[in-house]
Amino acid sequence: MLIVGAGPAGLYAAYYAGFRAMSVVVLDSLTEPGGQLAALYPEKVIYDVGGIPAILGRELAADLYKQAMTYNPVMLLGHGADQLFRLDDGSFLVTTTTGLLIHAKAIIVTAGIGVFTPRRLPVGQEYEGRGLRYFVPNPQELAGKRILVVGGGDSAVDYALMLEKVAASVTLIHRRHEFRAHEASVEQLRASSVRILTPYQVSAVYGDDRVTAVDVTDHDTKHVERLDVDEIVAALGFVAELGPLAEWGMELRQRHIVVDTTMATSVPRIYAAGDIADYPGKVKLISVGFGEAAIAVNNAAVAIDPSKKLFPGHSSDPDRHPTER
């Protein structure tokens, strides 16, 4: 079984496929497990996972990874899925962006929103990695620094609130008067010590080896203010695309993969689960992705070996646990 994507749905699918005594390979172009959860929202509190009143994104990602490793899947992080070749027996050969070749009897695509790349700050791109960043996986790296956050969506506001706890100072600029972020988060922002500048944009970036200052320009008055900063966190949104997956022959709908009630795609033995899967009434929640992953794995198991039962029993029943793989 090949699982493409190591986000929440993919990690749970890896666990469940192991529970069903399948050999599992997990691919993800990101170098850390957890998908968007770990890359974009590590310090965001998640409240809507059943049985867990509240948990940080990075903690949930770590727990899912630990659970996924129960049956020792092969975890190939930093390797993106590339070309797909179907063999005469119905199985597949998949090449990776790093040159690996994987043989799979079935595939589950749990690629979230696909390959996502941050929208670049229009100025100062030469400082990327030297004071300009687009992700904050570890806020402690910015402890004691003067931070400028750029953006008006949920990520920007979340980053500003997260970094307020550790930074020397945080300034948030947005090119519009109104924020796109969740109303409750914006209220929390306005009650915080974060300095808010709207409607401002970064017009110039200064520095030597690293960023030292920026000019920000008021969109309405054209007033320019220079800010001394140590780090710029640009949270301007992301451009998402399916990448090579779009060429695999699956029916697509608005960059999502169309599935039926078994999570099967239009290509036999390829399934999809999580945010990338689309069907009438779809709701994009982590908890929904878990259920879709289990449905996909169980149906894939039967597609590979029709003698297997669709429902394998409960994990709490000791004699239902697989002893051989």
UniProtKB/Swiss-Prot annotation:
FAD binds at residues 28, 36, 41, 81, 116, 275, 316. Its cofactor is FAD. It catalyses: 2 reduced [2Fe-2S]-[ferredoxin] + NADP(+) + H(+) = 2 oxidized [2Fe-2S]-[ferredoxin] + NADPH. SUPFAM superfamilies: FAD/NAD(P)-binding domain. Its EC number is 1.18.1.2. It is an enzyme of class 1 (oxidoreductase). GO terms for molecular function: ferredoxin-NADP+ reductase activity; flavin adenine dinucleotide binding; NADP binding. Keywords: FAD, Flavoprotein, NADP, Oxidoreductase. Binds 1 FAD per subunit. The keyword Nucleotide-binding does not apply. Homodimer. Belongs to the ferredoxin--NADP reductase type 2 family. This is Ferredoxin--NADP reductase. It comes from Acidothermus cellulolyticus (strain ATCC 43068 / DSM 8971 / 11B).
